Design a protein with these regions (language model features):
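The feature captures the catalytic groove of carbohydrate-active enzymes
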Residues: 51-66, 115-165, 180-238
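Acidic/polar, glycine-enriched structural segments that form the non-catalytic walls/loops
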Residues: 1-68, 87-107, 235
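Hydrophobic core segments within long, regular secondary-structure runs in both alpha-
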Residues: 29-36, 74, 90-101, 105, ...
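Soluble non-cytosolic domains of exported or imported proteins
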Residues: 22-29, 71, 162, 218, ...
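Sec-exported extracytoplasmic/periplasmic mature domains
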Residues: 36-43, 82, 98, 102, ...
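Active-site lining segments of carbohydrate-active enzymes
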Residues: 9, 15-22, 79, 85-143, ...
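Alpha-helix C-terminal capping/termination sites
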Residues: 21, 28, 40-41, 77, ...
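Conserved catalytic neighborhood of penicillin-recognizing serine enzymes
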Residues: 63-83, 87, 212, 219
Length: 238
């Protein structure tokens, strides 16, 4: 495998035709199946969801606490769950969202004086939803619960499990309710979030200063649009 990876990267051609060595569809297939194996072995009903470093990592104190980083990492872990016919491996994520909800409701009340529930860019086994760390490109971002909740309707779309959707409907509505109270109208008459960030991105101002906080990042609007769409469609189905 090491030799195949080296050839794929173009590091070692062994004097042979480069194109023939780089094209290794079987290695791509192997990596795809390895990803399925990691999900099957690491995310079973009744267990915890896939975390940041994986349950098989070698460190006693893994990087970033091996928590659930929900500004893309946790979601990305589950992007293939339904399309790869591993719906049952998706279930631990919904258990985590259930644990997050009461904490997220308290965070919404205490921090924003809003109803519903909210989570920022990290959570853990106990479903902590408050902002974590002090790194501006990530910390002040209230979209974690909303993005995770998009997985609820995706699971329904693949399984057509109405009982599951009915059980999760209040959670979907709670994530959406927060934004009906949190968003505000900008000078152009648009409903926007803010302050928020484009997760782990920065920008340069006209004066050349580096910034991270902004009003109405596109990612927030996209997640909220999908979340509201899911709530409306779920209500129609139920």
């Amino acid at each position: 495998t090491d030799a195949r990876l080296s050839r794929l990267r173009g590091n070692d051609f062994d004097g042979k035709d480069a194109a023939g060595l780089i094209l290794d569809n079987k290695l791509t297939e192997l990596y795809f199946n390895y990803g399925r194996y990691l999900m099957i072995s690491g995310s079973r009903p009744g267990s915890q969801p896939l975390n940041l470093q994986g349950i098989w990592n070698q460190d006693m104190w893994p990087a970033w606490g091996s928590r659930f980083t929900v500004n893309i990492n946790t979601e990305m872990n589950y992007w293939c769950a339904e399309s790869c016919n591993l719906s049952e491996c998706h279930l631990p994520l919904f258990d985590l969202i259930r644990r997050m909800r009461p904490n997220g409701e308290q965070t919404a009340r205490d921090m924003y004086h809003c109803g519903g529930f909210v989570c920022h860019h990290n959570t853990d086994l106990w479903g902590d939803c408050a902002p974590q760390d002090r790194w501006m490109p990530a910390t002040i971002w209230p979209m974690g619960a909303a993005w995770l909740c998009l997985h609820i309707f995706e699971h329904y779309q693949y399984t057509l499990d109405r009982d599951f959707l009915a059980q999760q409907f209040d959670t979907l509505c709670g994530a959406a309710q927060f934004f009906t109270e949190y968003m505000f109208e900008n000078s152009a008459g648009q409903l926007v979030t803010g302050p928020s960030v484009s997760p782990e991105n920065t920008y340069l101002t006209e004066s050349g200063a580096k910034g991270s906080l902004c009003i109405g990042p596109s990612m927030d609007s996209q997640i909220i649009t999908l979340l509201f769409t899911d709530v409306l469609e779920a209500a129609r189905i139920l």
